[in-house]
């Protein structure tokens, strides 16, 4: 995390661990909400920060659900789509020898391979391989009638959504879950899609970080008292964020003090554990 992000975590009552000769700081406890926030959110105004966070949440959800939802709808539940859209999907697939599941898996694995190759290659060459390679492979696959143009657009948009997640490690977990959702949706349709979402949601609700629910502040409202929701998907104005999160609320709940708009940080001793 960035230095200002680590400093903000200390002010919120979290612990920050530093390892010798490493530029990475470990913040505990952490929640899913922290992986979708950036330090820049606190430099921008409320509307801009809230809009950026909303985009990240939507992108994170679509990064692992969009291919599975496409397979469930086009293979099992075509009646929920308008007729012109269904005809466009089937016209795009004319001449493709593989089932839609194989098409999606082929393109997803190709994009994952290009992404991994781009990370390992140095500097500008890695970015060039990721962008140009994706365009060339996608266009070549469409020209050879191996995949439909709809699948190429779908996979490219899914990859774009994963790039919108601030934490690369957090985005990697969504990339893994994406394949599980694809298999379940291709097997059971919309029911498999919902089952996979339910299993993921139950697993996240069961996780804890240092004794605190991983999905705070969306769960555990009895702990947060409704205050931590002000800094979740919607970031309230900074003058409203005067209370520290639940991690430090036992001894000192007030982060800001002052009259009217004259807010300053309290002078407190911060101990780095």
PLM feature spans:
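Transmembrane alpha-helix detector for multi-pass membrane proteins
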Residues: 59-78, 93-169, 173-174, 179-185, ...
């Amino acid at each position: 995390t960035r230095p200002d992000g680590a400093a903000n975590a200390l002010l919120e009552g979290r612990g920050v661990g530093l390892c010798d000769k490493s530029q990475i700081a470990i913040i505990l406890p952490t929640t899913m909400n922290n992986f979708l926030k950036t330090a820049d959110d606190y430099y921008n105004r409320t509307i801009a920060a809230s809009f950026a966070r909303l985009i990240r949440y939507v992108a994170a959800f679509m990064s692992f659900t969009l291919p599975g939802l496409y397979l469930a709808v086009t293979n099992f539940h075509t009646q929920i789509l308008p007729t012109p859209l269904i005809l466009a999907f089937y016209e795009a697939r004319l001449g493709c020898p593989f089932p839609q599941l194989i098409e999606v898996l082929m393109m997803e694995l190709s994009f994952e391979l290009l992404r991994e190759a781009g990370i390992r290659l140095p500097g500008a060459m890695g970015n060039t391989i990721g962008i140009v390679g994706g365009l060339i492979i996608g266009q070549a696959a469409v020209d050879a009638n191996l995949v439909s143009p709809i699948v190429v657009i779908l996979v490219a948009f899914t990859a774009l959504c994963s790039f919108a997640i601030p934490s690369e490690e957090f985005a990697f977990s969504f990339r893994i879950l994406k394949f599980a959702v694809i298999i379940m949706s291709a097997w059971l349709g919309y029911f498999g899609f919902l089952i996979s979402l339910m299993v993921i949601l139950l697993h996240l609700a069961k996780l804890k970080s240092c004794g605190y629910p991983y999905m705070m502040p969306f769960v555990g409202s009895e702990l947060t008292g409704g205050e931590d929701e002000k800094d979740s998907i919607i970031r309230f104005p900074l003058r409203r964020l005067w209370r520290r999160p639940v991690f430090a609320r036992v001894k000192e709940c007030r982060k800001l003090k002052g009259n009217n708009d004259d807010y300053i940080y309290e002078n407190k001793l911060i101990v780095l554990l």
